Regions:
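Short hydrophobic targeting helices and cationic amphipathic motifs
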Residues: 7-10, 15
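Short, Lys/Arg-enriched N-terminal segments with co-localized hydrophobic residues
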Residues: 20-37
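Active/ligand-binding-proximal structured segments within catalytic/core domains
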Residues: 68-102, 112-113
Length: 198
């Protein structure tokens, strides 16, 4: 089983000079700049001007004989709506991860669930080769769990979490309900909310 440290969406690419030893111990400034050139990662090639809330396949990675599918659970319109605050995102992360890890069908297929740095959504990594439509019921179920949750947020204690005070259940529930309006009417939009825009 792959662990949560497997984060392919980060797409880090090491320079070609990694591990390269020069006889002089030095390289020219021009060579250094050439060696440090990095490719744009896949997630930066998506047109965020056209991107709207939905469920998208971000990438698929082969790991040995297995496939890991990374999903973009986009909750807000990039650069149009206010981004989510860390407290509600943190709460959704705790609740979503708890839900997924305990799911009867996807618990052992869940590799990772966590927030995007831009704070417009979450990444969900599942072991298996999936399309957006395959997991739409799972995502709806998860956000219904967040929307309807009452009580103490799992893991919201100083022993269990490194920033346990940064939680906002009320806003997490509100945002989950807002996203569910998209998910439950996903086929009614003029543009696809299951495939990235061209």
């Amino acid at each position: 089983m792959l662990g949560p440290a497997f984060l392919p969406f980060l797409g880090v690419i090491f320079p070609r000079s990694a591990g390269k030893v020069c006889s002089s111990g030095n390289i020219s400034e021009k060579e250094r700049k050439e060696e440090m050139t990095m490719e744009k990662i896949a997630s930066f090639t998506i047109d965020h001007i056209k991107l709207q809330p939905g469920v998208y396949v971000s990438r698929k990675d082969k790991v040995g004989d297995s496939t890991v599918t990374t999903f973009d659970l986009r909750m807000t319109s990039p650069n149009e709506e206010p981004v989510m605050n860390t407290a509600e995102m943190h709460t959704i992360e705790h609740l979503g991860a708890t839900f997924l890890r305990n799911h009867k069908d996807f618990g052992d297929k869940t590799v990772y669930f966590g927030p995007m740095g831009c704070r417009t959504g979450f990444y969900l990594l599942l072991a298996g080769d999936y399309e957006s439509k395959d997991i739409l019921p799972l995502v709806v179920e998860m956000y219904e769990f967040v929307r309807d949750f009452e009580g103490e947020v799992p893991g919201a204690s100083p022993k269990d979490c490194g920033n346990y005070l940064d939680m906002n259940l009320g806003m997490a529930k509100y945002l989950a309900a807002k996203y569910l309006k998209v998910l439950t009417h996903i086929d009614e939009f003029p543009e696809s909310r299951l495939v990235y825009p061209e």
